[in-house]
Each structure stands twice: as structure tokens, then as C-alpha cells.
Amino acid sequence: LCGWLQDTRNLGGIAFLQLRDITGVIQLTLLKKKLDADDYKKWTNINRESIVSVRGIVKENKEAPGGVEMLPDNLQILNEAETPLPLGVIDKIDSEIETRLNARYLDLRKSEIAANFKVRAAVSGAVHKHLRREKFLEVQTPKIIASATEGGTSLFEMKYFDKTAYLAQSPQLYKQMLMGGGLERVYEIGPAFRAEEHNTPRHLNEFISIDIEMSFADDDVVMGVMERLVDSAARAVAKETEALETLGIEPIELNLPLPRITYDEAIEMSNGKAEWGEDLSMEATREIAAQMNGFFFITKWPLSLKPFYIQPDDDPKYSRGFDFMYNEVEMTSGGQRVHDVNMLKERLKEQGLDPDGFNHYLDPFRYGMPPHAGWGLGLDRLSMIFAGAKNVRECVLFPRDRTRMTP
């Protein structure tokens, strides 16, 4: 066996060592009378978190972790760890998350931290599998763009040879161009960047976004895709029984179809915490969440609160846009898109944007753009929900926020 030596208890005539790898922990039992004195001394004085290789006899022991132990006859130190460790791996002392992120390579050795990423991997795998099952084609779109095309959100500016470029905040406009290209159903799981100065447990400046776009579909159809996908992810996570036990949580179960309330109903449910025509604050969504349970949709938002590419409703005061929520946490926004080029130009002007700066985006709309709809969902935030984490950074290997660029 090979792994990390996480702990040693030397009782004189007998010593218990704990060897750990990604599958778990096994007890190594050293009997002083059966070993060379130098070997016993050496093996019981190895620094914590050193890499060792061990060979011996495995036997049942109900008192040992996992119900088995090994009686080693050979132990080799492959790489001895320095001491002291920057971060304790098995210590019961809770370290601040910033301290843990600074030594993420040690933090990940903790079973409860590794469990977060087993949950995340289950979510990611289920998303790919589900969207392929629904006949979506995986695509990759550029992350370096020439202009701030969506408006609203601050972008990261960068030097691109002798020009100024930006990091993409989403693949939104490219997804729509692909609808004009006849691909009909596309999805992408990739990085997105937003230069927002949020400093909350839910926000990052670099995140992984799950995006879909679907031709000949409206907002209702893609909400159906969303709830089926999240249900598939929930079922995949439920199979990660060891990770869930380590985290001390129960799997989330969905009952489809998920509840849908309108924006007007949400305003009423906010008990005066929100006014019509305003975005919903965290205080308002908490009031609403207290009357809901788990995942739900908020539909028929005011058109003025949605991006230029969202289709107006039959009543032009409203839109065909929606938000997807988990209790008070906003998971995503989506909706039916404008597919008429003249309406799109008007929507751009209404939001103070110049249509002439959007020609690359508008061109496909001039030559046969189908009705279409879509959404974008953060993989990081979805993983946070399924792992029962309080901070999205717990489910991101090396998070990037307004203060962190390393490691």
C-alpha cells in the first residue's frame, strides 16, 4: 500500500500508524518485539503527511478503522514531509477558509473537503450525461472577446497584442449565433469571468458556467430542461453515499415539476421587502423562500429588469425571462430570446446600447434566426447546494475572488 502517514501513536511496545489514500484510512499495527529495534524507532518517528510504501499481512480487526489492520514487515519512506505543517490535516481545530485556501494542497487531504469535490464531480458528470441524452451538442466558445457586448456587468479588460480585449462574462451571444447556424441544441460547460466587486459566500469572479441554448423553444421548454437536469444531478449525488456520510448530509430529492411563481406573486410574498419594478434583494428572497421549499422558478419578470436579448411577453410590460432559485439563493437566469432583428435593435437602443457595435452578433438574425431560448447555470453554486456547503469556495479548487489570485 502507498499513501500519506497521517498519524502515529506509540505506546511503547506497540504503535498504531494511520495510512491514508483517496479511498480511506487503514491502521498499521507495529509490534516492537517482532521488528528490528532500528526499524521500530524509525517507523514510529516519521513526520506526519510523509509519503510511505508499506507491505505486510492484512487481517480483520473490528476495533481498527474500516474493520481491518495491516501488520507491516516492510515500510519505505518515499518522501518525508517537512515539519511543522502549514495546515493540520487531521487536527480538530477549525482553520479560517483563507488559511485553508493558502494551503489548499493540504486542505484537500481532509476527507470532508475531498468529499465536496466528489459531489462536484458527480454533478458535472450528470450534467454532461443528461444533456447528451436530450440531444444537446457540446460546444466551446471564445473567452477572449473584442467588446463589452452584453452590457450591465463589468468585464475584465486585458491587452491583446496591440489591442484591448475582454474576458467573456458568458457565452450568451455566441450560443445565439449557433442557433442561427442551425445547430439547434447546444451546451457548454466552461469558465466565465465577471469583474464585480461582490465579496459574499456565493460570488466568485471566475466561475464555471453550464449554458444551454435551444431552437424552436420558449421559456417553458427550457425550464423543463433545467428541472430535469437538476433532478439528474441530484440522483447522481445521491449515489455518492460515502461522500454524503462524510459531509453528514442527506441527499436532496426533487419532485417534478418544480414550483413556478410569477414575479408579481413573488412581490406579494416578499411582505413589503420588495417593490414592483425592483430586483429582488436577499431580504426579499428570504421572505419568499420561507414560503417555498428548495428549488423553484420565478417567471414573468418586468422587461426593464432583463437583458436586451430577452423576449417581451404578450403584455410588453413583462418578459419571457425567469430566475431559478434554491431557497433564497439565485441559481440562474434564463428565458426566451428575441429572434427578430428589428425588435433586437430596438431593445438595444432601449438599454442605451448602439446596434452598430453589435453587427457580428446581429448578422445571423438577418438571415433566418429561429425562435430560441436558453439559460446559464453556475456549476460551482450548484455543487455548493448539493454538498451542503455554506461558501461556494468550499467547492472550487482554487477560487478567484476580488482579493485572491493565488495559489
Which residue stretches match the model-derived regions?
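Metal-assisted phosphate- and nucleotidyl-transfer catalytic regions
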Residues: 149-150, 228-325, 350-363, 367-368
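Short coil/turn segments at secondary-structure boundaries
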Residues: 86-89, 120, 140-144, 188-191, ...
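Alpha-helix initiation and N-capping motif
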Residues: 84, 94, 101, 105, ...
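A generic secondary-structure signal for well-formed alpha-helical elements
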Residues: 9, 54, 60-62, 79, ...
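Class II aminoacyl-tRNA synthetase-like tRNA-binding/catalytic domains
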Residues: 1-215
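Alpha-helix capping and helix-loop boundary segments enriched in small/acidic/polar residues
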Residues: 165, 198-199, 217, 254-257, ...
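Extended, domain-scale alpha-helical bundle/helix-rich regions
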Residues: 217-229
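TRNA-recognition modules of translation machinery and tRNA-sensing kinases, especially anticodon-binding
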Residues: 181-191, 200, 204, 208-218, ...
